[in-house]
């Protein structure tokens, strides 16, 4: 894909989807490195859209075989704001929000934080369902994961 033409850097697009919230959910990602694409996806029976957005990013980082420079694009403001604005404060506050409440999806945020620290990660945001080829493919994979789970 033309959108993946950055040399020596992994470019990834991630997405999560949910049928019902909570409900059956799926996540998908497409990773590209030097022109080679890899598609990954998975699903859960009882989850939320935000958990699936987080899982897509987590599974993307878990798919890397060594320390990498990676740009991860998401259409999730929850993921984008969480990683760029909220995470440092949550950690400093003992995984509590500014309102002193437990951080939702703390388990996944902690996993994502740990994985992010193993790589040189740049986060990007794209508007969902706006014709971005990488985002559309990640969305397709997330929905494929849901369809396969429903079909079982």
Swiss-Prot record:
InterPro entries: RNase_H (IPR050092), RNaseH-like_sf (IPR012337), RNaseH_domain (IPR002156), RNaseH_sf (IPR036397), RNaseHI (IPR022892). Mg(2+) 2 binds at residues 15, 139. It comes from the Bacteria. Its main location: cytoplasm. The keyword Endoplasmic reticulum does not apply. Belongs to the RNase H family. Binds 1 Mg(2+) ion per subunit. May bind a second metal ion at a regulatory site, or after substrate binding. Mg(2+) 1 binds at residues 15, 53, 75. Monomer. It is an enzyme of class 3 (hydrolase). The lineage of its organism: Bacteria, Pseudomonadati, Pseudomonadota, Gammaproteobacteria, Thiotrichales. This is Ribonuclease H. Disulfide bonds: none annotated. It holds the Pfam family RNase_H. Its cofactor is Mg(2+). Residues 6-147 form the RNase H type-1 domain. It is found in: Cytoplasm. Its EC number is 3.1.26.4. GO terms for cellular component: cytoplasm. Endonuclease that specifically degrades the RNA of RNA-DNA hybrids.
């Amino acid at each position: 894909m033309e959108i993946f033409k950055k040399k020596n850097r992994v470019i990834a697009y991630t997405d999560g989807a949910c049928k019902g919230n909570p409900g059956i959910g799926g996540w998908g990602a497409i990773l590209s490195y030097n022109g080679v694409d890899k598609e990954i996806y998975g699903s859960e029976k009882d989850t939320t859209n935000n958990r699936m957005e987080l899982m897509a990013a987590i599974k993307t980082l878990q798919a890397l075989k060594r320390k990498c420079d990676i740009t991860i694009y998401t259409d999730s403001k929850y993921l984008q704001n969480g990683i760029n604005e909220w995470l440092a404060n949550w950690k400093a506050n003992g995984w509590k929000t500014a309102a002193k409440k437990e951080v939702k999806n703390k388990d996944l945020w902690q996993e994502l934080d740990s994985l992010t620290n193993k790589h040189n990660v740049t986060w990007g945001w794209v508007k969902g369902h706006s014709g971005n080829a990488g985002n559309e493919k990640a969305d397709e994979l997330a929905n494929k994961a849901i369809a396969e789970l429903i079909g079982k």
